[in-house]
Structures are given as C-alpha cells and as structure tokens.
Amino acid sequence: MKWINTACIAMVITVNAMANALPINGMNTGQIAALYPNLFVPAAATFSIWSVIYLGLIGFVLYPFISRKALDSSVSLLFQLTCLLNISWIFAWHYLLIELSVIIMMAFLGVLIAIYKKLNSQNRLSFWLLDVPMNIYFAWICVASIANVTALLVKWGIELPYPELITVFLIGVTQVLVWFINSTKNNIPYSLVIIWALLGIILKRSYSSPFFPEIVVAAAAGILFTTMYTGLSWRNQLMTSKPV
C-alpha cells in the first residue's frame, strides 16, 4: 500500500507540474482562473502554498517507511482517491469544464473531511507527518472550493449585486469554518492556511482597482478572529489534555 501511495503522489506532482509547464490545453492554471475574475481570489503569490502542501504530502507517504506503525489501510485508500480527484480536477479545469471541476472539488473536499476525521495522532512523528500535512491540504481545499464555486457563478454570468459584500460574506464563511474546526479539535495548521488565504486577498486588493476597503477590513478582521479563536482553543486544549 505504501508504494501505491508513493506512486500516486508522484503522479499528482507530475500532472500539476505539466499543467503549468506544457501547459495543458495551452493555458496554465492561473490563466484559466483569470478567465473568471472575482473578488475572492487571492494574489497569485498565495498559491505558492502548493509547494508546502506537496512537501507535506511527500512526508505523508514517507511515514510508513520510517515508522514502525503502518498507515491505516482505509486512510491510504482515501489518500489514493484524493490523488485521483486532484488529477481529475486539473484536467477538468484546464479544459474549461468548470461545472465538472466543481463536482470533483466537492468530492475532493468530502474525502479530505473523511481523512481528517480518521486521523488522530498519538505521537509527534505521526502528528507532523500525517496530521499537519492533511490539515493544511484540507484547509486549502476548503478555500479552493469557495473560489471554484464563485468561478462557476462567473462563468454562468450570474451578476450578484454588491460583489464586494458577497466577498465579505465568503470571508465570513471561512471564519465559520475556523470556528467549527477549532471548536471540535484545536487545529493550528488549518487556521494558519486560512490566515494565509486572507492575507492573499488583502494583497490582491492592495494593487487592484477598485480597492474595496470593506473587503480588506473583513479579511483583516478574519485574521484577527482566526488568531484569537485558535489561540483560545489551543489554551483550552493545554488545560484539559497533554499536548501532542
């Protein structure tokens, strides 16, 4: 199973690299996103988080090689499914099948939720190589799912009134997610990814016109809330149990 996991992540990294190097269907991933402009999309630099995600996933597949404990077979199967969905999404997105890409993204998110529920590390090695990578992955796909649905609305030509307020609402959705995730189990990696995404939104607005100060204020407030609530959740966890 561990060799299959290794092959799967190698395929994911290869396909994602090809998507921008070739690129697939003549456009890179960012150029396609530009076809469906919306105020929720963060600055291009924000997407560098994929380097962190892939580095973490490499650690994830290496875990069975360096640990005496094998990775749960059900988690391995779910991980392999995420790899298939990741690759499928790339092709759907690059061939402008946005409706299909949303369906794939929702399935992708569902599988990551299943993995999130199954992982519960009992030692530092599994925490850093299993929990942290998957929490980062899960958080970013939450953000990507919101952006993907927004892109679909743009493709359909649905012009909602006051797009800046819609974006403020979407930022609010990220905060509901932070609250829900951290109220069940303190998750600093998840929160850090949300902060990163909100910083990307602020950066994008700083060099875009119009500026939309309400979006910047909402994103800044989101960063503050995420930091404070995650810190409070972490403190409560320390008071009730031993740290991992």
Question: Where are each of the predicted segments found?
Answer:
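N-terminal membrane topogenic signal
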Residues: 1-7, 50, 192
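Alpha-helical transmembrane segments of multi-pass membrane proteins
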Residues: 9-26
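Membrane-interface helix caps and helix-loop-helix hairpins in membrane proteins
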Residues: 89-103, 121-125, 154-161, 180-185, ...
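Alpha-helical transmembrane segments and their membrane-interface exit regions
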Residues: 106-117, 171-176, 198-201, 222-229
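Central hydrophobic cores of alpha-helical transmembrane segments
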Residues: 81, 189-201
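Short aromatic-rich membrane-water interface segments that cap or initiate transmembrane helices
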Residues: 34-49, 130-134, 157-161, 165
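Membrane-interfacial loop-to-transmembrane alpha-helix junctions, especially the N-terminal start
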Residues: 70-79, 186-191
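Membrane-interface capping segments at transmembrane-helix boundaries
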Residues: 66, 117-122, 228-244
